[in-house]
Regions:
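Glycan-processing catalytic domains of CAZymes
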Residues: 17-265
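Bacterial N-terminal signal peptides
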Residues: 2-10
Length: 265
């Protein structure tokens, strides 16, 4: 039933234009990803790709290749999970393989610094940093400053940085003018759509619930950040609405058929 749902979503919802401008495919298998061509901004998890793979993706006409990097939680499938399990802060709702982590811990900050360096050496163009939302769940000065420290270290790699989510942190950091020139863009998920995790389906977010993120993204734009939207399973009608909103505001969007971000269609 789920696979049928995904097929219908693609046939009715995703425009060809959004496929080429911006694609978030951090869950796509390496062999499939290496066949991707002509995408302006492509997001992958470069930990599972070699330097030669990144060169191949560039040769395929993919202009800007960003690597996913999880700065705010620890995933159980990472090779070094056991080394950092003792600084986990709590369960990550809807994602059984993840736990929020203490970003103020110097060992964690060193881990992220080292990962950023390794990814940079593979030839990526930028970082797609996830789970700054740890500050939403644990709003302490230590967690806030831990994220700032991590961003300052990543900035030394001289790569473009997009923050996925993290609105509570980003809002405060903009108020403090702490990320000017360090963070270049934000990606916001589910402005127009919503994920129903219990039955693995998607739906349209009620209009009255969209205002918060629209206001937040307007603030990000004013601050000088490039804005990206990542939506899930939008119908053809809703896709037109998303496209019009993004065109009015100078934003870029992707509409994924899968919460795992592992397929084009």
């Amino acid at each position: 039933m789920v696979s049928i749902f995904f097929v219908l979503v693609v046939m009715n919802g995703i425009s060809a234009e959004s496929q080429k401008d911006y694609k978030v495919l951090i869950g796509m298998e390496r062999d499939k990803a290496l066949s991707l061509k002509g995408i302006t901004t492509l997001i992958i998890d470069a930990e599972f790709f070699s330097q030669e793979d990144i060169a191949q993706l560039h040769a395929n006409g993919n202009t800007h290749i960003f690597s996913y990097l999880n700065i705010g939680s620890i995933e159980t499938f990472r090779d070094d999970y056991a080394d950092f399990a003792n600084i986990a802060l709590g369960h990550y709702e809807n994602w059984d393989e993840e736990e929020w982590v203490n970003v103020a811990d110097p060992r964690w900050q060193k881990r992220i610094k080292n990962k950023a360096q390794l990814l940079s050496h593979k030839g990526i163009d930028g970082f797609f940093l996830d789970n700054a939302d740890v500050y939403y769940h644990y709003q302490t000065p230590e967690i806030y400053q831990g994220l700032i420290t991590i961003l300052q270290e990543i900035h030394k790699e001289n790569k473009t940085v997009i923050i996925n989510g993290g609105d509570t942190f980003i809002t405060e950091a903009m108020e403090q003018n702490a990320i000017k020139g360090i963070v270049n863009g934000v990606n916001q998920e589910t402005v127009f759509t919503e994920i129903h995790f219990k039955n693995n389906t998607f739906g349209a977010k009620p209009v009255e619930d969209r205002g918060y993120f629209m206001e937040y993204l307007a603030q990000c734009k004013t601050y000088g950040l490039t804005v990206y939207l990542l939506e899930y399973g939008a119908t053809k009608k809703l896709t037109k609405e998303i496209k019009a909103y993004c065109e009015r505001n100078g934003f870029t969007y992707d509409i994924s058929p899968s919460v795992e971000l592992d397929k084009l269609f």
